[in-house]
C-alpha cells in the first residue's frame, strides 16, 4: 500500500462540503468531447485506460480514521475498458446520449457511495460522430487537470495510431504536491501570506449578488442554470484593438466586474477569483484539485474609464498571485469565523486560458461541459480566444436565479460591450444597463397624471356636508353629530380660534385624547386656515416641549388635566376644549388655501431631536381624492378612527369619510392597543373600513377565533395596512379568518401618508412569492423611482434606492432648510421638480409593482437560527450600568476552528460608571429575556468600542474573548464523566473540571464533534456518534447517554414518552394517532414560542397500551397515568390527531373529573366514535369507508418515513393500526365540560356530517377551523403553515 497522505489544498473543503451536503452527486465534474471524423473506438478505449493509469490521483482511496481523513494511491486498482455504445439506429441519438450522461450524473456519486470515482463512455451517435463522456470526483481533479488528462489520453491515442510506443506520463506524483504543501505551511512564506490576506480581509467590502435573496454562507446547489454567451460579432475584438495597451484577459475581467457591480448596484463589492495555484510548484503538472478561490475586492469609480479599471484590477491580481497558495478556508478561519458561516464573496470570476483543444488527425473535437461542481451563487467563466473574440459561460444556482432573469442579465452584458466598443472613453458610471423599451416601461408605470381640483380639505368637507346635512357624520361613546351639526361645531371652534389670534398660515398644537372633540379640533384648525400639530400625550414632557419650541404654534388646544404639563413652555397660549360649543351657523369660512400647510407631524431624528414634517393642502387632497376613487366610500360606510393622531395614517381617517358622506366613529383612547376592545368596537358600530399597522394586525388576528371573527369582522369591507412591511403569511391568515379584502399601502411621513398601493388578498396575494406583500404601484400624480448610486434608473429586478416624486411630497422640514435641501433634492429627470430619497431599498417586479427589500441590518444565521444582533444589542443596553453594547458572532476557540460552524455569540459591553460589570449576573438577566440561541455565550467588558477611521463600529477589531473553562461546579464523576471531561480538555485546549461544561460553549463545533465521537468510541468501547454529542453536549448529559443500556439508547424515539422539545414554560402533550407514534408532531416546534415544551405520548410495542388494553378506556387510563407522572397538576394542554384526538378528549374529561384545569384541547380531524360505523355490520365486516380511511392514514404515515422504516417498526405500525380498529369497535365518548379547538379536513368530510352536531353531546364549547385538505394531510407541514399559527395564538392567550 502506498503512503497515507493528508488531504491538502482544495481537498479538505470538498470533503467537508460533501459530508455536510444532502446532494448526492454535487462534487462530480464531467464533460463530453464531441468527436467528428473517423475514430478507432477500440483503440481510443484502450488509450483511456492507459491515460487514466498515468494520473495517480485517479487511483486515490480515502478513509476516515479517528476523525482524520487520509488518502493513498491504490497501486492495485485497474481501470476497465470504457463501454462503447452505438446509438446510430436510435430515433434520437443525441437526446438518448444526453439522457445516458445525465442518468450517470444523477446517481449517488459521493466518495463513499461505492460507485467508481472515474467513469468514461464512448457513445456513437452517427457514422463519424462520437460523444466521449468523462466524469470524475472533484477530490481527484480540478478544472485545470481535467482537460490535461483528456489531452494525454488523446496524445496516447494519436501515438498508437502512428505505431509508436506509449508516451511517458507527464504528471507529477501527488505526493510531491502534498510534501510541498506541508513544507509551505511551516514556512515564512505561509506567514507572509497569512499577513497579506489578513489585511486584505480587513479591507474587503461586503459580498454582492445579482439575486435579491440574501447571500447565504453555504447554499451550494448542483442544480445549475448554464448560459453560454458568444461575442463573435467583433465588438469585443474591436474594443480590444482600440485599447491595445490592455490585455484581453484584463479587459474581459473589467467588463465582467463592471457588469456585476452595476447590476448589483454596488460599486464596491467582494467577488471570488479562481487562481490556478500551480505556477512554480510541483502542482503545475499534477492532477489533484489545487485551484483556489480567493476574495477579490472590486472597487469601481464612477469617473474612471474601462481601461483604467482593467489596469487597476490587473495590478491588484498581480499582487494577489504572489500569495495565491494560501487557502481560502484559512482566510475565513483566521478571521474568527468558520467556512459556511457567512459568505466571503458573491459571484466567482474565472479567466479560463486552459487549452481545451485536442489535436487528433482528421478529427474535430469540441468539449461540452456537463458538471463543474456546485455553485453557491453565480460563476462567470471568461474565455478570450486566439481570434480576439470572447466567450462567457454563466453558471447560476437555480435556487437563486431563474432562466428569463439570467437571459436578461446576459443581454445587458452584450449591451455593455457594445457601448464601450462605440466609445472606449465612456466612463464606468455613465454606461447604460437599461434594455431597449425599459425606459418606456418605467415611464408607463409612473404615468399617474390625473387632474384634480384646486381645493382644500375644508372645502371638500363643506361641499359634502351640504349634500347630506342630516346623515350621521361623527360619533364616539357619548356623542353623535350629523353632518350639519358637525359643521356647526367646526365653524364655532374655528371662529373661537380666530378670536384667540390664530391666522391663516399659523400652526395650532393639539393635545387631546381620542374623542369627537379631537376630530372637531383638527377640522376647525383647517377651517381657520392653519395647520394642525398633533401632540401624543404619551410622549415624555421634554420631547413635547422640544416640538413646541421648534413649531412655535400660535395656540395649544388641550384639556384641563393635560394643561399643567405645558406650563413651562414660554409664550404658549392655550385653549381647553372638551364640550360642544354654541352653534354659529355652518357656512364655510373659506380661509384655507391650497398652498397652505395642512399639518405638521414630528418624526424621530438622527441627531436625537425630532424633526417636523410639513405637508401641504394640495398634497393631502390628492391623496384623499385618489383613495376615494380607488376604494370608494358611500353613505353606508362606517370608518374607524383608532390610529394615534401623531401617526400620519390618522390623517385619512380624520378626513376621508367626510368627503364621501360616510360616518367616522372614534375608538376609546388606548383601545387600539387592545384587540378584544377592537373586536367589540367593530361589532358595536358595524365598522366597514379600518387600518392596522401590520404588527397590530398580527395581534388582532391572534385574538380571533372563527366565531369571534364572524361576530366582530362581519361588516368589514376593506382593511388597510401600512407603517411596516406586511407579511404575506399574515395576510393569508387574515383572509382565511375573515375574508375581508386587505390592502397594503406604503409611504413615508414626507409624502402625504401613502404613495403606493397593492392588493393583499385574492389572486394578487396568491401570486406573492416573497415573505412580504409588495408596496405596489404609485397613486395619482406621484412617481416611484428606483435609482443606483449614480442616480441612474435600475432595470426591473435590480435593487436600488427608492425615490419619490410628485404632488404629494412634503413642503420640507420645519425650520430645517439644510435638512430639507439634503433630503428633497432636484429631480434629474424633471427640471424644476423635487425628489425625496426614502432610504428604502426596493426593486421593480415583473408585474410593474415595487417590492420593498428593507434597509441594511445586522441579521445573520448561526446554524440555521436567524438572529437579529440589533435586538440583542437593545436588550443588553437596557442592563444596569451598561452605556454601550454590541453583539458579534465569532469563533471563540481558534484551535477548534478547523471547519464547520464554529461561531458563537459574544456580547461586548461598555460600563456607564467605568466600574467592573458583573457579567455573570447580566448574562442571567439576558436569559430571562432572550431565547437561548440569542444569549451570548460570553460577555466581555471593554473600556470603549473600537471605531473605524470613519467613526463607525469596527467589528473586525473587536477582540476575541480569552478562552476559559467554566468555573468548576460539580466535579466529573469517576468513569464516563472523567473520560469525557478529559476528551473535552484535549480537543478544546482548556482544563474542563465541571460536569456541566458544554462542549459548544467552550468553542466546540460540528467538525470537532466528529473527532470527539471517534475518540470516545475508542475509549469507552462503544460507538459514540456526532449526533449524540450534538444533543447531549455537556459532560454529564453525554455520560448519561453513553452509560445507558444499549437497548434503551437504540430505542430512543420508540418509548412511551417522546420529548420533542424542552422549554422553560408550560408543556403541550401530543397524543399519537393509530400508528402509535407521535413523531409527526415535531412540526410544532416551528410555530410554538420557545418557552413551550412539547412531549409526545406514544404506544410502542411490545406491551404498549394499544396492544394490551381490552378497550379504549383502558388506553386512556394508561396514558392518563403517564401524563400525571410528567405533570401532576394542571393547567394541561392536550393535542391529538385522529385516534389521538379521541384519546386526548377522553383524558381531558378524566382530568376535569379529578378537578384539574384543561386549558387547551386541540383535535386534528377527530370525530366521536359514535359517529363512525365501527360496529359489525355483516359477518365480521367493518364499514369499508372507515377501514379505507384508516388504511390511507397508515400508508401516509409509512410514506412519511421516506423508506427508512425497519422491519421492526413496520411490524409495530401494522400491529398498532390493527389494534386501533379493534379498540374503536367498542369505544364510547365521555362528556368534557370545557372548550375544544377542532381542525376539520374538508376534503374527506363525510357528506352530511356536522362537526357541531357530532361533538355537541361530548364537548361543551367548540371552536372550528376548516382546512382545505384531506384527513391524512392535516398533520402535514404544508397544512401546518395555517394550523400552526392558530395553535400558537390559542396557547398564548
Curated annotation (Swiss-Prot):
List the cysteine pairs that form cystine. Answer: none
GO term, biological process aspect, one: enterobactin biosynthetic process
The record lists the effect of residue 1079 to A as:
Abolishes enterobactin production
Please report the stretch or stretches of sequence annotated as the Carrier domain.
Answer: 971-1046
> For this protein, what does the record note about how its cofactor is bound?
Binds 1 phosphopantetheine covalently.
Q: What is its EC number?
A: 6.3.2.14, 6.2.1.72
* UniProt-annotated stretches for the region Adenylatione: 482-887
Q: Name one GO molecular function term.
A: nucleotidyltransferase activity
Coiled-coil spans are: none
User: SMART domains, per this entry?
Assistant: PKS_PP, PKS_TE
Which parts of the sequence carry O-(pantetheine 4'-phosphoryl)serine? Answer: 1006
Free-text function comment from the UniProt entry: Involved in the biosynthesis of the siderophore enterobactin (enterochelin), which is a macrocyclic trimeric lactone of N-(2,3-dihydroxybenzoyl)-serine. EntF catalyzes the activation of L-serine via ATP-dependent PPi exchange reaction to form seryladenylate. Activated L-serine is loaded onto the peptidyl carrier domain via a thioester linkage to the phosphopanthetheine moiety, forming seryl-S-Ppant-EntF.
Q: How does it assemble?
A: Proteins EntB, EntD, EntE and EntF are the component of the enterobactin synthase. Components probably do not form a stable complex. EntF acts as a catalytic monomer. Interacts with the MbtH-like protein YbdZ. YbdZ binds to the adenylation domain, but does not alter the structure of the domain.
The similarity annotation says: Belongs to the ATP-dependent AMP-binding enzyme family. EntF subfamily.
Record-given protein name: Enterobactin synthase component F
Which species is this UniProt entry from? Escherichia coli (strain K12)
UniProt lineage: Bacteria, Pseudomonadati, Pseudomonadota, Gammaproteobacteria, Enterobacterales
What is this protein's gene name? entF
Amino acid at each position: 500500500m502506498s503512503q497515507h497522505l493528508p488531504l491538502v489544498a482544495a481537498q479538505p473543503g470538498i470533503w467537508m462540503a460533501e459530508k455536510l451536503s444532502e446532494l448526492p452527486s454535487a462534487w462530480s465534474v464531467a464533460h463530453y468531447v464531441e468527436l467528428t471524423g473517423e475514430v478507432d473506438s477500440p483503440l481510443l478505449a484502450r488509450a483511456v485506460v492507459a491515460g487514466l493509469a498515468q494520473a495517480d490521483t485517479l487511483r486515490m482511496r480515502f478513509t476516515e480514521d479517528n476523525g482524520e481523513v487520509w488518502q493513498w494511491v491504490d497501486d492495485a486498482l485497474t481501470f476497465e475498458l470504457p463501454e462503447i455504445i452505438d446509438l446510430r439506429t436510435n430515433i434520437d441519438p443525441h437526446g438518448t446520449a444526453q439522457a445516458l450522461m445525465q442518468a450517470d450524473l444523477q446517481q449517488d456519486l459521493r466518495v463513499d457511495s461505492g460507485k467508481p470515482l472515474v467513469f468514461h463512455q464512448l457513445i456513437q451517435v452517427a457514422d463519424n460522430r462520437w460523444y466521449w463522456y468523462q466524469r470524475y470526483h472533484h477530490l481527484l481533479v480540478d478544472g485545470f487537470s481535467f482537460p490535461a488528462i483528456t489531452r494525454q489520453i488523446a496524445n496516447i491515442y494519436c501515438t498508437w495510431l502512428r505505431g509508436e510506443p506509449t508516451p511517458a506520463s507527464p504528471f507529477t506524483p501527488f505526493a510531491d504536491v502534498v510534501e510541498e504543501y506541508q513544507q509551505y505551511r511551516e514556512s515564512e512564506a505561509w506567514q507572509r501570506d497569512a499577513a497579506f490576506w489578513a489585511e486584505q480581509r480587513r479591507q474587503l467590502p461586503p459580498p454582492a449578488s445579482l439575486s435579491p435573496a440574501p447571500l447565504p454562507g453555504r447554499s451550494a446547489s448542483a442544480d445549475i442554470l448554464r448560459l453560454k454567451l458568444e461575442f463573435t460579432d467583433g465588438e469585443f475584438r474591436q474594443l480590444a484593438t482600440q485599447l491595445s495597451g490592455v490585455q484581453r484577459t484584463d479587459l474581459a475581467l473589467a467588463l465582467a466586474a463592471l457588469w456585476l457591480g452595476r447590476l448589483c448596484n454596488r460599486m464596491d463589492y467582494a467577488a471570488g477569483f479562481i487562481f490556478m495555484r500551480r505556477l512554480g510548484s510541483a502542482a503545475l503538472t499534477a492532477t489533484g484539485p489545487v485551484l483556489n478561490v480567493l476574495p477579490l475586492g472590486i472597487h469601481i469609480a464612477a469617473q474612471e474609464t474601462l481601461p483604467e479599471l482593467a489596469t487597476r484590477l490587473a495590478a491588484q491580481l498581480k499582487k494577489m498571485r504572489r500569495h495565491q497558495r494560501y487557502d481560502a478556508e484559512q482566510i475565513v478561519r483566521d478571521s474568527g469565523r468558520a467556512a459556511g458561516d457567512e459568505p466571503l464573496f458573491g459571484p466567482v470570476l474565472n479567466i479560463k486560458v486552459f487549452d481545451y483543444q485536442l489535436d487528433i488527425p482528421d478529427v474535430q473535437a469540441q468539449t461540452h461541459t456537463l458538471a463543474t461542481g456546485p455553485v453557491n451563487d453565480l460563476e462567470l467563466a471568461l474565455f478570450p480566444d486566439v481570434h480576439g473574440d470572447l466567450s462567457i459561460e454563466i453558471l447560476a444556482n437555480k435556487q437563486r436565479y431563474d432562466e428569463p432573469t439570467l437571459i436578461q442579465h446576459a443581454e445587458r452584458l452584450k449591451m455593455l460591450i457594445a457601448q464601450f466598443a462605440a466609445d472606449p472613453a465612456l466612463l464606468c458610471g455613465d454606461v447604460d444597463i437599461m434594455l431597449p423599451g425599459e425606459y418606456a416601461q418605467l415611464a408607463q408605470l409612473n404615468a399617474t397624471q390625473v387632474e384634480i381640483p384646486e381645493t382644500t380639505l375644508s372645502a371638500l368637507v363643506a361641499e359634502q356636508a351640504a349634500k347630506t346635512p342630516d346623515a350621521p357624520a361623527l360619533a364616539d361613546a357619548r356623542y353623535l353629530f350629523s353632518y350639519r351639526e358637525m359643521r356647526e361645531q367646526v365653524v364655532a371652534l374655528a371662529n373661537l380660534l380666530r378670536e384667540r389670534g390664530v391666522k391663516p398660515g399659523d400652526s395650532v398644537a393639539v393635545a387631546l385624547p381620542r374623542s369627537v372633540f379631537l376630530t372637531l379640533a383638527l377640522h376647525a384648525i383647517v377651517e381657520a386656515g392653519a395647520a394642525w400639530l398633533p401632540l401624543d400625550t404619551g410622549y415624555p414632557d421634554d420631547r413635547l416641549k422640544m416640538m413646541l419650541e421648534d413649531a412655535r404654534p400660535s395656540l395649544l388646544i388641550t384639556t384641563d388635566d393635560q394643561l399643567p404639563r405645558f406650563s413651562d413652555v414660554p409664550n404658549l397660549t392655550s385653549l381647553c376644549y372638551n364640550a360642544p360649543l354654541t352653534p354659529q351657523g355652518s357656512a364655510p369660512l373659506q380661509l384655507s388655501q391650497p398652498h397652505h400647510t395642512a399639518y405638521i407631524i414630528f418624526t424621530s431624528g438622527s441627531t436625537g431631536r425630532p424633526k417636523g414634517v410639513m405637508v401641504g393642502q394640495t398634497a393631502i387632497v390628492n391623496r384623499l381624492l385618489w383613495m376615494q376613487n380607488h376604494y370608494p366610500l358611500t353613505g353606508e360606510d362606517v370608518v374607524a378612527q383608532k390610529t394615534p393622531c401623531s401617526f400620519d395614517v390618522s390623517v385619512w381617517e380624520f378626513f376621508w369619510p367626510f368627503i364621501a358622506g360616510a360616518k367616522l366613529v372614534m375608538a376609546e383612547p388606548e383601545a387600539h392597543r387592545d384587540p378584544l376592545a377592537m373586536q367589540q368596537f367593530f361589532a358595536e358600530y358595524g365598522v366597514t373600513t379600518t387600518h392596522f399597522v401590520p404588527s397590530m394586525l398580527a395581534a388582532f388576528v391572534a385574538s380571533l377565533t372563527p366565531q369571534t371573527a364572524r361576530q366582530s369582522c362581519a361588516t368589514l369591507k376593506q382593511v388597510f395596512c401600512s407603517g411596516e412591511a406586511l407579511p404575506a403569511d399574515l395576510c393569508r391568515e387574515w383572509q382565511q379568518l375573515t375574508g375581508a379584502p386587505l390592502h397594503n399601502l406604503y409611504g413615508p411621513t414626507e409624502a402625504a401618508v401613502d404613495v403606493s398601493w397593492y392588493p393583499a388578498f385574492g389572486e394578487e396575494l396568491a401570486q406573492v412569492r416573497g415573505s412580504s406583500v409588495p408596496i405596489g404601484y404609485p397613486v395619482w400624480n406621484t412617481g416611484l423611482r428606483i435609482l443606483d448610486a449614480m442616480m441612474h434608473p435600475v432595470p426591473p429586478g435590480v435593487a436600488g434606492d427608492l425615490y419619490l416624486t410628485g404632488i404629494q411630497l412634503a413642503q420640507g422640514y420645519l425650520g430645517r432648510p439644510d435638512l430639507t435641501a439634503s433630503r428633497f433634492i432636484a429631480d434629474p429627470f424633471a427640471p424644476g421638480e423635487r425628489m425625496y430619497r426614502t432610504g428604502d431599498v426596493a426593486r421593480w417586479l415583473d408585474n410593474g409593482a415595487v417590492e420593498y427589500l428593507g434597509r441594511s441590518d445586522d441579521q445573520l444565521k448561526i446554524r440555521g437560527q436567524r438572529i437579529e444582533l440589533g435586538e440583542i444589542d437593545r436588550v443588553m443596553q437596557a442592563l444596569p450600568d451598561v452605556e454601550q453594547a454590541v453583539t458579534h458572532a465569532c469563533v471563540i476557540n481558534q484551535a477548534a476552528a478547523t471547519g464547520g460552524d464554529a461561531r458563537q455569540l459574544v456580547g461586548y459591553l461598555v460600563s456607564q460608571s467605568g466600574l467592573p460589570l458583573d457579567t455573570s449576573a447580566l448574562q442571567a438577566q439576558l436569559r430571562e429575556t432572550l431565547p437561548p440561541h440569542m444569549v451570548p455565550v460570553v460577555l466581555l467588558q471593554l473600556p470603549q468600542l473600537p471605531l473605524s477611521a470613519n467613526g463607525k463600529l469596527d467589528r473586525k477589531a473587536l477582540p476575541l474573548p480569552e478562552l476559559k473553562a467554566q468555573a468548576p461546579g460539580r466535579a466529573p464523576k469517576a468513569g464516563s464523566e472523567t473520560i469525557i471531561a478529559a476528551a473535552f480538555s484535549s480537543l478544546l485546549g482548556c482544563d474542563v473540571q465541571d460536569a456541566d461544561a458544554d462542549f459548544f460553549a467552550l468553542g466546540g463545533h460540528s467538525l470537532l464533534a466528529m473527532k470527539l465521537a471517534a475518540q470516545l468510541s475508542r475509549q469507552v468501547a462503544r460507538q459514540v456518534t456526532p449526533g449524540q454529542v450534538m444533543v447531549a453536549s455537556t459532560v454529564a448529559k453525554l455520560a448519561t447517554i453513553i452509560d445507558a443500556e444499549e437497548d434503551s439508547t437504540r430505542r430512543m424515539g420508540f418509548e412511551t414518552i417522546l420529548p420533542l422539545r424542552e422549554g422553560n414554560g408550560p408543556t403541550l402533550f401530543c397524543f399519537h394517532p393509530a400508528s402509535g407514534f407521535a413523531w409527526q408532531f415535531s412540526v410544532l416546534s416551528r410555530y410554538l414560542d420557545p418557552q413551550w415544551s412539547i412531549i409526545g405520548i406514544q404506544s410502542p410495542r411490545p406491551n404498549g397500551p394499544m396492544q394490551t388494553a381490552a378497550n379504549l378506556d383502558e388506553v386512556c387510563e394508561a396514558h392518563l397515568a403517564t401524563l400525571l407522572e410528567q405533570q401532576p397538576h394542571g393547567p394541561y394542554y392536550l393535542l391529538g390527531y385522529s385516534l389521538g384526538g379521541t384519546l386526548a378528549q377522553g383524558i381531558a374529561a378524566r382530568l376535569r373529573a379529578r378537578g384539574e384545569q384543561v386549558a387547551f384541547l386541540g383535535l386534528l380531524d377527530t370525530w366521536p366514535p359514535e359517529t363512525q360505523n365501527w360496529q359489525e355490520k355483516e359477518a365480521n365486516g367493518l364499514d369499508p369507508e372507515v377501514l379505507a380511511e384508516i388504511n390511507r392514514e397508515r400508508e401516509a404515515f409509512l410514506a412519511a418515513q421516506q423508506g427508512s422504516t425497519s422491519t421492526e417498526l413496520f411490524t409495530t405500525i401494522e400491529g398498532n393500526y390493527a389494534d386501533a380498529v379493534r379498540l374503536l369497535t367498542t369505544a364510547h365518548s365521555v362528556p368534557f365540560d370545557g372548550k375544544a379547538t377542532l381542525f376539520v379536513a374538508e376534503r374527506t368530510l363525510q357528506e352530511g356530517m356536522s362537526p357541531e352536531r357530532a361533538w355537541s353531546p361530548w364537548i361543551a364549547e367548540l371552536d372550528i377551523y376548516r382546512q382545505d385538505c384531506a384527513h391524512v394531510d392535516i398533520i402535514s407541514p404544508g397544512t401546518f403553515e395555517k394550523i400552526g399559527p392558530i395553535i400558537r395564538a390559542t396557547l398564548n392567550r
